[in-house]
Amino acid sequence: KTAIILEDDCLPTKEFFCFINLMLKRYKNNKKISSICGSNHLSTWKSSDSSYLISKYFNSWGWATWQDRWQKVDFDNKNLLKVVNNHKFIHHIGSYRALFYWRYILKKILRNKINSWAYTYNYFNFIKKKYHIIPTQNLINNVGIGIKSTNTKVLPVKYFFSKLKLNKTTSFSFKHDKYNFNKYDTAVEDIIFSKSLINRIKW
């Protein structure tokens, strides 16, 4: 069984559904893939001829998954904290910059400063070394972004989401990607993770 999840402020292109359904079929037996995402927070990413890429970062704005993957997710953040505080977590997350950031976010979740299931879902997939399919062109327009929003106001909207554009004329050749995600993930991290030493000391 599969499910496509669209929140009320996420507007998809017509290509979104074609993309999601094709990827669900292609990766249904690949347990390393946890979800299919419709949004690309860099708006467009073209490092190869493929129409999608594989990333360690999950995007919750228009996505899909399989029942067997979803049922295995542990949403107990206290259990996650034990793992994240373990020095071996660096092997799951890839860099100390990412490690300090995600520890900081998890502590804010445990103090009820952030209320988002998507962060917990990301942590679980980090630990289990699961990945996500991301389209090389964005297929979702989130009309709920702003200072009054529930979650996005805590993110670097000016530098991150301002670049997110809806590609209405997107067409896919469906040339398939390999596990070749380092450059995309690094580009996402360069935007999400502050380069300010003062801000990073807070982590």
Report residues per predicted region.
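An acidic/histidine-cluster motif and surrounding catalytic segment
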Residues: 1-5, 10-203
